Amino acid sequence: MTQGFAALAAGEFESARALFKKAEASPFDNGDAEEGLRQIASRETNQIVDRLRQDSEIALENGAWQTAIDLLRELAALTPRSVAVKAQLNMAEERLALESEGQGYLDDPLSLQSDEQLQRARTWVVNVSRLSPPKGQMSTQLIALGRLLSLARSRYDVTLTSDGMTTVKLLRAGDNGALGSLERTRLQLIPGRYTVTGRRAGFIDVRTDFEVPPDGGSILIDIRCEERIP
């Protein structure tokens, strides 16, 4: 028993466990072996808790939200009464959700064509700007999304050409989308996705999808019905 507790004090848990189990099988054991095994389990748990605390703190500082969440969930299972751990877990989950939302706007900037999506993105910028550090990737997302928002309602030239016999319509433009028959016209459109259609009696309808990027550019779309209906 003395050897077992000496090994335990030295942090040699495997050696201590083997000695306590051997003593536990002895008819002379008075319960000390069980106490020794309990202390080993407690010390091992404490070591795990300390490691999880350290690793989760590092993950939070680095803005590695998913890693922090995984570690904090393990830690919460071992320390269910810890209010601090629950608070950190909630923070990491909220910031992961915010980071994912911000990345969604950056991955699909043309979605800001929608007024509703634009307002959500603006709200995201306000909310993230008010967060205390750490912000992780959201710091760079703020800069990138701020630029996109500044361009979201800029208007860029789009030139449409046709044959003067095709009836042209720009979808997503309401009543203003009916352009009639034309040979050449210039539109000013905000960044987004558009569809232009063409109709002509006796000919197959045509349709062209195009995009206006956030930073504009030279866009020329030709739309005309040329294939006769069999």
Residue ranges and their predicted role:
Residues 2-12, 17-28, 35, 42, ...:
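Short loop/turn and low-complexity linker motifs enriched in small/turn-promoting residues
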